[in-house]
Amino acid sequence: MTFCYPCRAFALLTRGFTSFMSGWPRIYYKLLNLPLSILVKSKSIPADPAPELGLDTSRPIMYVLPYNSKADLLTLRAQCLAHDLPDPLEPLEIDGTLLPRYVFIHGGPRVFTYYTPKEESIKLFHDYLDLHRSNPNLDVQMVPVSVMFGRAPGREKGEVNPPLRMLNGVQKFFAVLWLGRDSFVRFSPSVSLRRMADEHGTDKTIAQKLARVARMHFARQRLAAVGPRLPARQDLFNKLLASRAIAKAVEDEARSKKISHEKAQQNAIALMEEIAANFSYEMIRLTDRILGFTWNRLYQGINVHNAERVRQLAHDGHELVYVPCHRSHMDYLLLSYVLYHQGLVPPHIAAGINLNFWPAGPIFRRLGAFFIRRTFKGNKLYSTVFREYLGELFSRGYSVEYFVEGGRSRTGRLLDPKTGTLSMTIQAMLRGGTRPITLIPIYIGYEHVMEVGTYAKELRGATKEKESLPQMLRGLSKLRNLGQGYVNFGEPMPLMTYLNQHVPDWRESIDPIEAVRPAWLTPTVNNIAADLMVRINNAGAANAMNLCCTALLASRQRSLTREQLTEQLNCYLDLMRNVPYSTDSTVPSASASELIDHALQMNKFEVEKDTIGDIIILPREQAVLMTYYRNNIAHMLVLPSLMAAIVTQHRHISRDVLMEHVNVLYPMLKAELFLRWDRDELPDVIDALANEMQRQGLITLQDDELHINPSHSRTLQLLAAGARETLQRYAITFWLLSANPSINRGTLEKESRTVAQRLSVLHGINAPEFFDKAVFSSLVLTLRDEGYISDSGDAEPAETMKVYQLLAELITSDVRLTIESATQGEG
């Protein structure tokens, strides 16, 4: 009986309970709420609506829902009560007039269709607006709310109605029964009815317009949450085969390999099978349950920032391309999980072909992964099929995700971007007909990365182990306490706006048939990629682990007393809070002591106790691994660290000379760490940092000179140590250039790495990235761009020696002697 009674109740609700004030609806709501409280477990988006949406609970609030559903209304009520928002079932009393606190825009399909409340919603809007005409102090906040049970987009064929159509009572019952725990209540930013009344008037036509705009809002919101319908896979393949680009590539394949047209076409289909996703809503739901269970046991929290800007872009109809940094294989799952719980469609994800092994490959494919080879070179058919598939995803309106770094960072820093997929994204725009494409840079951070031990081995020369089921199981078996996770959405980059500003005539290159490569494409793609990396770093997340690792690795003994560590963390926190790296970066709100307690729970550090107090130690075997976490936020602290290094060395220095020194070294730092400031912004940033360092007592300012404060010299020295290894690396390369101005770039990179490895052994430098090939390659390219190396390949000895002398002052004498003697074959 308990099964059929709610069903009967759902059907009854459509037959005439329209008056809120009558006694029957009150009884009815109580009866209906009982099964709903058991069947429905919804979540609110955003997580805390009032502060995140700027709702003022001291002013009247009314709710607008897309269609008449008492189940939706009661689900909304539960979330409102949970978040201290007004009860939608309690009427609003305004100037002696009682009005319902909720409005249904549409009646929705019903078992019996004689009742059409459309006019009632318009009348209620008109009543609310009319009250604003008579009361100039009144300002009702109208909050649009969507309640969704399940989010299956449906298929393009074989379904007459989409699963998320407006449901009658019986249909709604089954939706709640099966999907009650896959539901969410989406609160939208409020609309001021006072502003509406003042700007547009209060007559009935305005009320009608308000209802019409609300209907459009809900339609867009549903599309943002559910996405477009999914094609039958074979239909998608047939459409791709029929495209002119693939048809031509098939002909070229048959001719170049001297095979039949049918065989060439089979090759194309095989590539589609290799590449294409096989998206399944059922797999998304199942994985969401598993991940929800897993995250709750492995992570102490997933911190998400700036998701509202992404939801708004999806609502406005943008084609979203998520471009996260790549730390771990966990990124794929974490980002899709976060997006799903933010009320957004999980994207189609470009995954490396190395992940296409059983059983991970089929699972990832059903979660939206499409697979990409490491290189397209020498395979025109493959590149054409992949490009056309990506373009088809865009044209159909699916969100897409790819890692612009091309692979996981082994050092914790951002890698130089790989631009192939980004180039294809812009080429898709040049086909015309797509919605506006917006790139969303995303910073993903962890307090524990499960692959970090493997990364350290690979950086020291070990062969990368091929991904496989046994390797995956070994990794999963090691998962324990992973601490906190961080997903920060950076500043979006609308591609159309970018191209309009930087390539005003880009539309002249549009070709709906062929993929084009205009002359401006490559430099523009390179600039966009570099800008994306800067925006990813702008959204960096400081946390307990990376802050503690930064401080302990700065100590030559990798150990500090608890008091010293607390003081150092306070230094970092105050710098980041009072001179924020960017408006998108995040800093913990917890105190330094609380962060240390949390970091100690991660079991990465040792604590020795004596009669004086605690000493916190980073064990030698952990030191190499912990550089990964330090490097996650190196960009956020490198400028104050460089300033501290210069002041520490000189004891006192004028602002102008400090600025000159920073100006010389900044281009290398900017290129290596994707720093956000241009050179002309540096004076203001350095002034702000100097003032903050003075406020902390690290330095004193006298007659426009910065002086070291002896009473806080340890904190300043630990801050300066954050730039120590970077300056040593630069010194190696500039010394080699000065000693041999005609050295070619390849040899310069190789010899720089050799000296760095020697330095690492002799001076106990634990950072694997210290002699990473990619780091020196990037540095040498920057030296060419900055004019230290001419187009002919020769260095400018006077300039390089001047920079080396500056660097030599900032490194210790024993390190300097090792560098200078290494080129002479001495030890």
Curated annotation (Swiss-Prot):
PANTHER family linked: DIHYDROXYACETONE PHOSPHATE ACYLTRANSFERASE, GLYCEROL-3-PHOSPHATE ACYLTRANSFERASE
GO MF: glycerol-3-phosphate O-acyltransferase activity
Any Pfam family hit: GPAT_C
Annotated family: Belongs to the GPAT/DAPAT family.
Keywords: Acyltransferase, Cell inner membrane, Cell membrane, Lipid biosynthesis, Lipid metabolism, Membrane, Phospholipid biosynthesis, Phospholipid metabolism, Transferase
EC number(s) recorded for this UniProt protein: 2.3.1.15
Entry's Gene Ontology cellular component terms: plasma membrane
Catalytic reactions on record: sn-glycerol 3-phosphate + an acyl-CoA = a 1-acyl-sn-glycero-3-phosphate + CoA
Primary localisation category: membrane
Native organism: Shigella boydii serotype 4 (strain Sb227)
Pathway it works in: Phospholipid metabolism; CDP-diacylglycerol biosynthesis; CDP-diacylglycerol from sn-glycerol 3-phosphate: step 1/3
Short sequence motif HXXXXD motif: positions: 325-330
Domain free text: The HXXXXD motif is essential for acyltransferase activity and may constitute the binding site for the phosphate moiety of the glycerol-3-phosphate.
InterPro entries tied to this protein: GPAT/DHAPAT, GPAT/DHAPAT_C, GPAT/DHAPAT_LPLAT, GPAT_PlsB, Plipid/glycerol_acylTrfase
SMART domains referenced in this protein's UniProt entry, alphabetically: PlsC
Name used for this protein in its record: Glycerol-3-phosphate acyltransferase
Entry keyword Nuclease: no
Keyword Transferase: yes
Gene Ontology BP term (one): fatty acid metabolic process
Annotated localization: Cell inner membrane
